[in-house]
Every structure is written in C-alpha cells, then in structure tokens.
Amino acid sequence: SNSYIGGLSDGFYIIIDCVDDEEYMGFFCISTKTLVEPQWFSVTIADEGIGINELVLVEDMDAGFGYVDRFGHVVIECQYDWATPFVEGVAQVGKWIDDDYYEYYIDTTGNEINLMMNSFTQHQLLYL
C-alpha cells in the first residue's frame, strides 16, 4: 500500500492510503494532534474553514455521507446520498426514501432544522 498526505486545509491534512487500487481517506488535525486513519471514500473540509464545534464531512462507499468530529468520532452516521460540509452549524443533506428524493438542512446533532426544502419523485428528476 502507498500513503500520501494532501494539502493543508484549515488546520487539517488529508491523509490518503492506496490499497489494491482503492483510495481511502483520513485526516490529521493539527489543533487536536489527532491522526484519523484512512477509512472513507472521501473527506471534505469546508472552504470557509471549520469552527471549533464544526464537523468533518466523510463518505462511506456503501453507507453514504456522514460527519465526524476533529478526533474522528462519528457524530452523525453515514446515511445521506448527498451532503455539504457544515458552515456555521448548518449542513444541507439529501436522501432517497423509496422513489422520492428529499433535501433538507440539519444541525450538528443531525436534527432537521426546518421543513424539507425540495421533494422530487424519481420521474421528476429526469427533467431537471
């Protein structure tokens, strides 16, 4: 396996580990001096930076998107089909439920913080 370190972003280094032609990502957090072993398909740090209570967006190839803290502890299980990084305590997520796709906002505990923004059927998405 080959490992390498990506660029510095808001006090985080992205760590990438290549095993059998698969890439797994983790991170090193400078402020907590914590190395979180590569285990996800992707790791995303918000462009605006991460506040002290903000979370890191991670993607599991099978389970989808979720969020971990600066120590790598899972805070919101990987469960979303689409998600954005948290900015000022809010993230936007999307999820398929049966044949309907829902997008909504969540707080850093995973609770929905307003009504679902959009709801489309699979058929309607073909025409967007």
Name these PLM-found stretches.
Residues S1-L128:
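Residue-level detector of conserved, function-critical positions
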